[in-house]
């Protein structure tokens, strides 16, 4: 299959939608179009990006995100590679994924793996983090004010309003906001920026630039979403494990899209995804 990178949503949708903010309304309509033109009725789906080539991707990017040097860069850097404050970036796999089937009652098992680097580039302060998300096709990403602790997923109007949201995320949160634990943490978020469960994330104990590896999996039988994070080449041998029960059929629509978001606030760090794979079986 030929893979095409989609740098702006307006280039991929009718001109009527080009006037909409590409980070909100048009995303919802865009992914509804994906449901019509770019899904395959199948019991299984898989994709693999060993690296992110700028000219050979099935990836949607928006905000400050871009692909460069084989890397998916979620938030902005300056000309010297240093992280920029108040940056928000977004990416998604270019295809709708069937997570559940109401008629049969089935919910998909899935596993996604990715490698990443979070680097404050010389600073001792981290901020703010990134997330892997699964969102219903009609989920409205915020138009603005989603930087900092909102991680690009929410704004102050939606962050704690679970009735407005239809998204599940695993957050890699490096800055303690008022709704957070008092240290860097990895959390599972269900329709809100406040994690249902979280565990410490020793990002501040890793040498700057260290590559992390994450595996996120969902087991339909147990309904557990499980997260495992490790730094295999780091002298600080600390693994992170967390899991939480989720009934995806009651939280999200049958068809979803998956991807990453990242954000910085006044304090900044880089958020780079080096590789990404995903497999699901319904």
Swiss-Prot record:
Induction of expression: Accumulates in roots, in a RAM1-dependent manner, during colonization by arbuscular mycorrhizal (AM) fungi (e.g. Glomus versiforme and G.intraradices).
Residue pairs linked by disulfide bridges in the UniProt entry: none
Record bears the keyword Glycoprotein: yes
SUPFAM superfamilies xrefs: Concanavalin A-like lectins/glucanases
Gene Ontology annotations for the cellular component aspect, listed alphabetically: membrane
Residue ranges annotated as Extracellular topological domain: 38-282
Positions bearing carbohydrate: 161
Record's keyword annotation contains Glycoprotein: yes
Membrane topology: Single-pass membrane protein
Topology Cytoplasmic: residue spans: 1-16
Localization, UniProt: Membrane
Transmembrane annotation, as ranges: 17-37
Alphabetically ordered keywords of this record: Glycoprotein, Lectin, Membrane, Transmembrane, Transmembrane helix
Annotated GO biological process: response to symbiotic fungus
A Gene Ontology molecular function term of the record: carbohydrate binding
Alphabetical list of InterPro entries matching this protein: ConA-like_dom_sf (IPR013320), L-lectin (IPR016363), Lectin_LegA_CS (IPR000985), Lectin_legB_Mn/Ca_BS (IPR019825), Legume_lectin_dom (IPR001220), Leguminous_Lectin (IPR050258)
Function of the molecule: May be involved in arbuscular mycorrhizal (AM) symbiosis with AM fungi.
Family: Belongs to the leguminous lectin family.
Name of the protein in its database record: Lectin 5
Native source species: Medicago truncatula (Barrel medic)
Gene this protein is translated from: LEC5
């Amino acid at each position: 299959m030929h893979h095409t990178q989609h740098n702006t949503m307006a280039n991929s949708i009718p001109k009527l939608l080009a006037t909409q903010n590409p980070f909100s309304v048009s995303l919802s309509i865009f992914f509804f179009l994906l449901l019509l033109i770019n899904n395959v009725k199948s019991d299984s789906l898989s994709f693999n990006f060993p690296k992110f080539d700028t000219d050979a991707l099935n990836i949607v990017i928006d905000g400050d995100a871009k692909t460069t040097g084989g890397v998916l860069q979620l938030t902005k850097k300056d000309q010297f590679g240093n992280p920029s404050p108040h940056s928000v970036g977004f990416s998604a796999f270019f295809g709708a994924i069937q997570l559940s089937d109401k008629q049969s009652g089935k919910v998909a098992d899935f596993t996604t793996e990715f490698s990443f680097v979070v680097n404050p580039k010389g600073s001792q302060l981290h901020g703010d983090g990134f997330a892997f998300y699964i969102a219903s096709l009609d989920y409205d990403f915020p138009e603005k004010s989603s930087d900092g602790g909102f991680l690009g997923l929410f704004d102050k109007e939606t962050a704690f309003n679970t009735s407005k949201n239809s998204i599940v995320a695993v957050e890699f949160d490096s800055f303690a906001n008022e709704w957070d634990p008092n240290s860097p943490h990895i959390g599972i978020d269900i329709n809100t920026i406040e994690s249902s469960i979280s565990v410490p994330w020793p990002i501040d104990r890793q040498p700057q630039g260290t590559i992390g590896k994450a595996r996120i999996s969902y087991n339909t039988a147990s309904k557990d979403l499980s997260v495992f994070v490790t730094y295999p080449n780091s002298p600080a041998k600390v693994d992170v494990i967390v899991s939480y029960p989720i009934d995806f059929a009651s939280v999200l629509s049958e068809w979803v899209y998956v991807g990453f978001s990242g954000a910085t606030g006044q304090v900044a760090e880089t958020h780079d995804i080096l590789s990404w794979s995903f497999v699901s079986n319904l």
